[in-house]
A protein has these predicted regions:
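Functional cores of ribonucleases/endoribonucleases
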Residues: 1-99
Length: 99
């Protein structure tokens, strides 16, 4: 069941946010790769003092109440193991995230 919808304003912002999340979670990513257990890893980061939002999120409850989407300054990235990738993983998905 879909409870929210989210989007980045443009490709540049999506790439920036994704790279920032990966960089901020570098140690967790290295541990995940070393443990060789789960196929995917979800990591997040937030930039509350960032002037520009990284995206917009529409929550189902807000939509039903007649409210529009909200600007957000956080992102969630899902990584997937990929042995053929130089880093050992690829980005499965990335979305702006409402904290």
């Amino acid at each position: 069941m879909l409870t929210r919808s989210a989007s980045y304003p443009d490709r540049e912002t999506a790439q920036w946010a994704t790279q920032q999340v990966v960089t901020a979670n570098e140690q967790a990513i290295h541990r995940w790769l070393a443990q060789n257990t789960r196929a995917r890893l979800t990591v997040e980061a937030a930039w509350p003092s960032r002037e520009e939002p990284v995206g917009r999120v529409q929550l189902e409850g807000d939509l039903l109440a007649g409210r529009g989407p909200v600007d957000v300054r956080a992102a969630r990235v899902v990584l997937r193991r990929e042995p053929s990738s130089p880093l050992g993983f690829v980005v499965h998905t990335t979305v702006p995230f409402y904290l």
